[in-house]
Amino acid sequence: MKAPIPHLILLYATFTQSLKVVTKRGSADGCTDWSVDIKKYQVLVGEPVRIKCALFYGYIRTNYSLAQSAGLSLMWYKSSGPGDFEEPIAFDGSRMSKEEDSIWFRPTLLQDSGLYACVIRNSTYCMKVSISLTVGENDTGLCYNSKMKYFEKAELSKSKEISCRDIEDFLLPTREPEILWYKECRTKAWRPSIVFKRDTLLIKEVKEDDIGNYTCELKYGGFVVRRTTELTVTAPLTDKPPKLLYPMESKLTVQETQLGGSANLTCRAFFGYSGDVSPLIYWMKGEKFIEDLDENRVWESDIRILKEHLGEQEVSISLIVDSVEEGDLGNYSCYVENGNGRRHASVLLHKRELMYTVELAGGLGAILLLLICSVTIYKCYKIEIMLFYRNHFGAEELDGDNKDYDAYLSYTKVDPDQWNQETGEEERFALEILPDMLEKHYGYKLFIPDRDLIPTGNIEDVARCVDQSKRLIIVMTPNYVVRRGWSIFELETRLRNMLVTGEIKVILIECSELRGIMNYQEVEALKHTIKLLTVIKWHGPKCNKLNSKFWKRLQYEMPFKRIEPITHEQALDVSEQGPFGELQTVSAISMAAATSTALATAHPDLRSTFHNTYHSQMRQKHYYRSYEYDVPPTGTLPLTSIGNQHTYCNIPMTLINGQRPQTKSNREPNPDEAHTNSAILPLLPRETSISSVIW
């Protein structure tokens, strides 16, 4: 049965006058297009959803039944986006179906995302609107999609109700829904102050740890519907104006600056929670805002949030004055305000007077600090600094140019087979490492008595050798102290005077802890006797390293001279002089005369016997190399055989002077005692002719 004509006219009039006033995108083909509706559908893949035609829910004051009675038909189209081609939807009646003014998806698929346009029209009238549908997947490891959440805020200590949103289409009027709640996708033992009512979760007293994501889960048929709401907890809404932290309201703050320099005035304030209202903080000079000043040199920085907690903020803003002039001086005020009031505080920008006293004190303080630093550096690195200066700018030591040696080395000689575990390192250092480093590495010329002194030389010869040296090095090993190796310097008057008057500089090397050793008190007395004395500690094998403090200190105390270090090839000549360098030679004529005299007095049978016996014994006892010389059968040594050689023998000085020893004619020569008679000893190498172990 058709409706009466007056009734249809009234329906059309009501329909056309009840249109929602919104911005229309335009009209095409006589159809009014309301573009995309503000309501957007967002659903997880696999969940059901109902899309309603928005024309019946806000654009016109009618429903689907009245429109259909008025002869209007409803059609659905789908497009990928605004302006794209729209194609009619073919409903299959199962997964996607048209039911009155809606489309049902049971369930949704990813390809269902897009714009769905509903159009109502007849032959004379047309209107359409598009509805957006987004189908997404859960985030990895979560039960929700972070882009499809609802957002709620709650104030601390107040109550908050969280609803399970947009589930009206899945509720039955005759049945209570069964809804499960999760926090961060996990079941939770809810505290008693949290209550569940139908489709809501009620928190009676909000706490800070209530912040998080709440997910409600509802079963609809064979499907699951989930909605997630993120709850943010804030401080209670403030009813007070902001609080100025700096400058303070109660007093005027003075900030000094120099003309021509830059000035920075910083204002800090605390803002309570005021909802979504941003903090308002700014500077003024007098009654003018900073941006209203004519000077471009004066400007405000951006507002910076220093701290934020539960919506409460501590913020700051700076006023910068570039190249301060007289006109920039004056009073500046910082204002802060919110809906509850306004506060301000002032800063007086003042010209700084030059304070010459302070500047002078600062300059003197800087000089004093520099002086202290320089003295400290010099104290710590004095030796390194002096060595650097000597090596690059120093001149050779002129005092003592007429002396032949850089140093006289005094030590106690102990055979290696007598070294023990406690003193072995000290003896090796004194006999091998010390002379080898000084001569071969640093290039010094040493007088080593064991090497350079005529074996039977007397104490006057030692004094002359010390006098020809620029330094006296005494190596204080435990054996040296026990044997009182310094006695020679006390017995000879000339040597003692040299030490007391400071004619020679003494370097005393202590190789170990000497306290408690016999004769140690005499060592201390000796130190007080020597006028020019330097004591250097040798602390064991770690001091043997070339870059150690020990070698730097010793090089500093030695005379400075520009000498190329002696190489191993330079230290040895054709006569194989030994490990410590050039040897002193004895006059060839005197040695020949002495040898002839000595051998002439010896029994012929003892010559070869003693020669072999003495050499074999001394080779076993001494650690230096030994050298053999063949004695001519005539008992005299040709002059050419000892020329250009360093030949040594254990011959008394009386024989070198041409004297002949007195012997008893009635005494038979004893071969076993032949080695004790120095008058008949043959020519021996210098290693086996040492008559003393202390030099």
Curated annotation (Swiss-Prot):
Active site: 490
Record-annotated membrane-spanning stretches: 358-378
Segments of this protein annotated with the region Disordered: 657-679
Tissue: Detected in total brain extracts, olfactory bulb, hippocampus and striatum (at protein level).
Site entry: Essential for interaction with PTPRD: 34
Domain TIR positions: 403-558
Keywords: Cell membrane, Cell projection, Cytoplasm, Disulfide bond, Glycoprotein, Hydrolase, Immunoglobulin domain, Membrane, NAD, Receptor, Repeat, Signal, Transmembrane, Transmembrane helix
Spans within the Cytoplasmic topological domain: 379-695
Primary role: May regulate secretion and presynaptic differentiation through inhibition of the activity of N-type voltage-gated calcium channel. May activate the MAP kinase JNK. Plays a role in neurite outgrowth. During dendritic spine formation can bidirectionally induce pre- and post-synaptic differentiation of neurons by trans-synaptically binding to PTPRD.
Protein's name according to its UniProt entry: Interleukin-1 receptor accessory protein-like 1
Source organism: Mus musculus (Mouse)
Gene that specifies this protein: Il1rapl1
